Amino acid sequence: MPLIRVLASLLILQLSYGKSLDNGAKAITSLDRIIGGFECNPSEHRSLVYLYNSAGFFCSGTLLNHEWVLTAAHCNREDIQIRLGVHNVHVHYEDEQIRVPKEKLCCLSTNNCTQFSQDIMLIRLNSPVNYSEHIAPLSLPSNPPSMGSVCCVMGWGTITSPEVTYPEVPHCVDINILHIPVCQAAYPTMSGKNILCAGILEGGKDSCKGDSGGPLICNGQIQGIVSWGRFPCAQFLEPGIYTKVFDYKDWIEGIIAGNSNVICP
């Protein structure tokens, strides 16, 4: 049955990671990954944030403005800390900043963050972030992405699969926006609502363990949030599933504007 794609260092003892499904298919998991990519240029990921707690790194997110970060709902944890302006996780830039959540809001309710359904979460920071050489926001989408668009997904997730190798620096990989039926063929029970299907049909490039919550960027705008997919990653005809940010744009802008009554799609 489906398993949540979790960071192996956190839950490998509790979960049968990568276990086969009843029908012989590979396990559907979450907390995604970068396979087949390259080290990101520090100037190209100024909005990328690093989420961690006492157990270590677990997700990425995206800075939207001085006070708000966007990530996946299944990245919700206790005692989240947020590093901004990070490239090499062992090296601290002078302009690096650390914040904690003042408020966490999920689409269903402030206290009910789900794993896959409406996999989106806003984090309000405890104090505003100062923009700098290594820290800048990313724009929300003005329009949904076109089919076939080449977009970049990034994060500190494993760069090998099924073996797990976590890099010190974020990796980026270019993938394509695909038609929803492509993902429905790979995952017959999934809903096609409020998601993007993205990847490379022949395999070899994908997000993977540790990339969840990070951005899928198309033409300089965040169009997707890494949500879930198959493990091992980057397999033939098995793209990844991303939360479709454009469908949540009104909700995001309403929450940021202070409208607690805004309706989630």
From Swiss-Prot:
The residue ranges of the Peptidase S1 domain are 34-257
Keyword line: Disulfide bond, Fibrinogenolytic toxin, Fibrinolytic toxin, Glycoprotein, Hemostasis impairing toxin, Hydrolase, Hypotensive agent, Protease, Secreted, Serine protease, Signal, Toxin, Vasoactive, Vasodilator, Zymogen
- pH dependence of activity: Optimum pH is 8.0.
Q: Mind listing the GO molecular function terms for this protein?
A: serine-type endopeptidase activity; toxin activity
Temperature dependence of the activity comes to: Optimum temperature is 65 degrees Celsius.
Q: Disulfide bonds, which pairs?
A: C40-C172, C59-C75, C106-C152, C107-C264, C151-C218, C183-C197, C208-C233
Resulting phenotype, C152S: Is less stable than wild-type enzyme
Known EC number? 3.4.21.-
Q: What else is known?
A: Negative results: has no fibrinogen clotting ability. Is not a plasminogen activator. Does not affect angiotensin-converting enzyme (ACE). In vivo, does not show hemorrhagic activity in mice.
What does this gene product do?
Serine protein with fibrinolytic and fibrinogenolytic activities. Degrades Bbeta-chain (FGB) of fibrinogen first and then the Aalpha-chain (FGA). Gamma-chain (FGG) are also digested on prolonged incubation. In vitro, it cleaves high molecular weight (HMW) kininogen (KNG) releasing bradykinin that promotes vasodilation. In vitro and in vivo, it cleaves angiotensin-2 (AGT). This explains the reduction of blood pressure in hypertensive rats. Also has antithrombotic effects on thrombosis animal models.
The Swiss-Prot or TrEMBL record describes its family as follows: Belongs to the peptidase S1 family. Snake venom subfamily.
Record-given protein name: Serine protease harobin
